[in-house]
A protein has these predicted regions:
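Short aromatic/hydrophobic "clamp" motif used to bind/position activated sugar donors
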Residues: 53, 273
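A recurrent flexible, glycine/aromatic-enriched loop bordering the glycosyltransferase active site
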Residues: 86-103, 329-347
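Acidic donor-binding loop at a coil-to-helix junction in glycosyltransferase catalytic cores
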Residues: 118-130, 365-375
Length: 435
């Protein structure tokens, strides 16, 4: 039996599990996920020739009778079962998380068509990687659940700042929906265009795209504009499944965010354009709620916006949930400028964007900074903005973002914006890019 021991950052917990396995099953092969080297872990599993393997977390312990009982359970396991989930009863269930499988059928995992261990950019929540595989396999396989006291999971103690239940409640729908999503053969007429502009965001891109694929409504199109990235963005994009709703365009040089948004605007086929930053993601029902509101919006409404969930990225790119951030029901230009208030999501009426010629390129910093503020302020002078009092966006706060790196430039840009007696027009949105 091959055993993967996961979450090995704590040496005491890891040593306890390794000593336990060495005692009860010295013939088993044990691998630890040190530094989470996905390539090495997946390569080892690819070469594995046994019918089943096991996953444990550092600190988990097995009883001395577990091995003999497991042999009997595997012999009786139906062929349609992907593995075994052990439960110890409701009394030990923490935070209402379902127990992930301990025993996995090797052929079932290989039939999934994807690696068992996903890269961090595909799933930035390491605690849920086994749950993700569980949901993914549920489409074609069943699972056997056994009440068993021979498995003693390590007691989990969450620090006060870790809102574990809220985190799980927000991430689980995306994992379940993504596992069940079916790609259309023909592109539906899009009701909304999603603009995802990226520059050197390869480490975040796939999770943002996955949140689009997991939407509860499927009549969208995703326009990805790569602003001449120098990282492995193109390799990540090439790994995406073929989906007629997704179009990609790569700039021949780095032009900045406003230029990219104008390109996306020129390509948009839907009446509404939703902006999605490459390091953020959408809740599963975001598009459904936005489109439901769009159906009742007046022609003068140029922007739909809502509240958002805030996540802070740690030094090791771990995400810490900070709660819901509410935005004002009425956005005033002066208040928006003075407070540098983030507005998310931003869902624009395409007709209104064309009426002001899209985003400006001749603003300070060439449209590379604060393009969200300038477009909202310009729209607010001639159109209505509508607030939805519900969180519709996941916003990641990270120190390496362009906005955080250039925060000292905001005062000068704000002064320039306030001095514009007559608000200028944008610089794009009419000419489609060559492909």
């Amino acid at each position: 039996m091959l055993v993967y021991v996961l979450g090995t950052s704590n040496k005491v917990h890891t040593d306890a599990t390794l000593a336990n396995l060495s005692h009860i099953a010295p013939h088993w092969t044990v691998l630890c996920d040190c530094d989470y080297d996905t390539a090495a872990l997946n390569d080892h599993l690819h070469a594995y020739d046994r019918s089943f393997f096991m996953t444990l977390h550092a600190g988990d312990l097995l009883s001395s009778s577990f091995v003999s009982e497991l042999t009997e359970q595997l012999a009786a396991l139906p062929e349609h079962c992907a593995g075994i989930i052990y439960e110890r009863g409701a009394a030990t269930t923490l935070h209402h998380f379902p127990s992930p499988p301990l025993i996995w059928r090797t052929s079932a995992v290989r039939s999934s068509g994807r690696p068992f261990f996903l890269e961090k950019d595909e799933l930035p929540f390491a605690a849920y990687r086994l749950h993700d595989n569980l949901f993914h396999l549920k489409r074609d396989w069943s699972w056997q659940t056994i009440q068993h006291t021979g498995w003693q999971p390590r007691a989990k103690h969450y620090p006060k700042w870790h809102k574990a239940q809220e985190e799980w409640d927000l991430i689980r729908p995306l994992l379940e929906a993504g596992a069940a999503a079916l790609l259309p053969e023909v592109k539906p007429t899009p009701a909304i265009s999603i603009a995802l502009c990226t520059f050197n965001n390869a480490d975040y891109l796939l999770w943002a795209i996955r949140s689009v694929l997991a939407q509860s409504m499927s009549n969208w199109e995703l326009i990805i504009i790569d602003d001449a990235s120098s990282d492995n963005t193109q390799m990540k994009l090439a790994s995406l499944p073929a989906d007629p709703r997704i179009r990609m365009y790569t700039n021949d040089s780095n032009y900045g965010k406003s230029h990219c948004l104008n390109v996306a605007l020129s390509m948009a086929e839907a009446p509404w354009l939703l902006e999605l930053d490459a390091d953020d993601w959408l809740p599963q029902d975001a598009i459904r709620i936005l489109l439901s509101t769009a159906d009742t919006a007046t022609r003068e409404t140029s922007l739909l916006y809502g509240d958002y969930y805030e996540w802070t990225e740690g030094a090791r790119k771990q995400l810490i949930f900070g709660g819901i951030r509410k935005t004002p029901a009425n956005v005033q230009a002066d208040a928006l400028l003075a407070g540098a208030l983030p507005i998310a999501p931003r869902c624009y009426r395409v007709e209104a964007l064309h009426s002001i010629h899209g985003w400006m390129l001749n603003a300070p910093y060439g449209g590379r900074l604060y393009e969200d503020f300038e477009i909202i302020i310009r729209l607010s002078h001639s159109h209505q903005l509508r607030h939805l009092p519900v969180p519709l966006y996941h916003r990641r706060i990270r120190k390496s973002s362009i906005t955080h790196q250039h925060s000292e430039k905001y005062a000068g840009w704000m002064k320039w914006m306030r001095e514009q007696a007559v608000l200028p027009q944008g610089d794009g949105g009419d000419a489609r890019p060559s492909t």
